[in-house]
Protein backbone atom coordinates (compact mmCIF):
# COMPACT_ATOMS: atom_id res chain seq x y z
CA UNK A 1 0.00 0.00 0.00
CA UNK A 2 1.23 3.47 -0.84
CA UNK A 3 2.54 5.29 2.19
CA UNK A 4 -0.78 6.42 3.66
CA UNK A 5 0.95 8.79 6.08
CA UNK A 6 2.76 10.50 3.20
CA UNK A 7 -0.49 10.83 1.22
CA UNK A 8 -2.23 12.06 4.36
CA UNK A 9 0.37 14.78 5.02
CA UNK A 10 0.08 16.02 1.42
CA UNK A 11 -3.71 16.21 1.75
CA UNK A 12 -3.48 18.05 5.09
CA UNK A 13 -1.00 20.53 3.60
CA UNK A 14 -2.92 21.07 0.35
CA UNK A 15 -6.45 21.25 1.76
CA UNK A 16 -5.73 22.70 5.20
CA UNK A 17 -7.82 20.05 6.94
CA UNK A 18 -7.23 18.38 10.29
CA UNK A 19 -5.30 15.09 10.19
CA UNK A 20 -8.17 13.33 11.96
CA UNK A 21 -10.45 14.07 8.99
CA UNK A 22 -8.18 12.28 6.52
CA UNK A 23 -9.27 8.64 6.47
CA UNK A 24 -9.26 6.14 3.58
CA UNK A 25 -13.03 6.62 3.26
CA UNK A 26 -12.93 10.44 3.27
CA UNK A 27 -14.35 11.93 0.06
CA UNK A 28 -12.33 14.92 -1.17
CA UNK A 29 -15.29 17.13 -2.06
CA UNK A 30 -18.03 15.95 0.32
CA UNK A 31 -15.93 15.29 3.44
CA UNK A 32 -12.81 17.42 3.03
CA UNK A 33 -14.35 20.43 1.29
CA UNK A 34 -12.08 20.40 -1.76
CA UNK A 35 -13.07 22.33 -4.87
CA UNK A 36 -11.89 21.76 -8.44
CA UNK A 37 -8.79 23.93 -8.00
CA UNK A 38 -7.91 22.09 -4.78
CA UNK A 39 -8.12 18.75 -6.56
CA UNK A 40 -5.86 19.93 -9.40
CA UNK A 41 -3.27 21.19 -6.90
CA UNK A 42 -3.55 17.96 -4.92
CA UNK A 43 -2.96 15.85 -8.04
CA UNK A 44 0.10 17.95 -8.90
CA UNK A 45 1.51 17.55 -5.38
CA UNK A 46 0.96 13.77 -5.46
CA UNK A 47 2.60 13.51 -8.89
CA UNK A 48 5.64 15.39 -7.64
CA UNK A 49 5.95 13.48 -4.36
CA UNK A 50 5.56 10.01 -5.83
CA UNK A 51 7.19 10.63 -9.24
CA UNK A 52 4.06 9.57 -11.10
CA UNK A 53 1.71 11.01 -13.69
CA UNK A 54 -2.05 11.07 -13.17
CA UNK A 55 -4.10 11.68 -16.32
CA UNK A 56 -7.13 13.96 -16.19
CA UNK A 57 -9.31 10.91 -16.82
CA UNK A 58 -7.78 9.03 -13.88
CA UNK A 59 -7.93 12.11 -11.65
CA UNK A 60 -11.69 12.31 -12.20
CA UNK A 61 -12.05 8.73 -10.92
CA UNK A 62 -10.18 9.47 -7.70
CA UNK A 63 -12.88 10.46 -5.22
CA UNK A 64 -11.54 9.33 -1.84
CA UNK A 65 -8.25 9.18 0.04
CA UNK A 66 -8.32 5.38 -0.36
CA UNK A 67 -8.67 5.81 -4.13
CA UNK A 68 -5.36 7.72 -4.13
CA UNK A 69 -3.43 5.01 -2.31
CA UNK A 70 -4.92 2.27 -4.54
CA UNK A 71 -4.08 4.25 -7.67
CA UNK A 72 -0.47 4.80 -6.59
CA UNK A 73 -0.11 1.13 -5.62
CA UNK A 74 -1.39 0.02 -9.03
CA UNK A 75 1.09 2.29 -10.82
CA UNK A 76 4.01 1.04 -8.79
CA UNK A 77 3.20 -2.68 -9.15
Curated annotation (Swiss-Prot):
The keyword Transit peptide belongs to this UniProt entry's keyword annotation: no
Record-listed O-(pantetheine 4'-phosphoryl)serine modification sites: 36
Gene Ontology CC terms: cytosol; membrane
Pfam families from the UniProt entry: PP-binding
Post-translational modification: 4'-phosphopantetheine is transferred from CoA to a specific serine of apo-ACP by AcpS. This modification is essential for activity because fatty acids are bound in thioester linkage to the sulfhydryl of the prosthetic group.
Cell compartment(s), UniProt: Cytoplasm
Function: Carrier of the growing fatty acid chain in fatty acid biosynthesis.
Matches recorded under NCBIfam families: acyl_carrier, PRK00982.1-2, PRK00982.1-3, PRK00982.1-4, PRK00982.1-5
Protein name in UniProt: Acyl carrier protein
Species name: Leptospira interrogans serogroup Icterohaemorrhagiae serovar Lai (strain 56601)
Gene this chain is encoded by: acpP
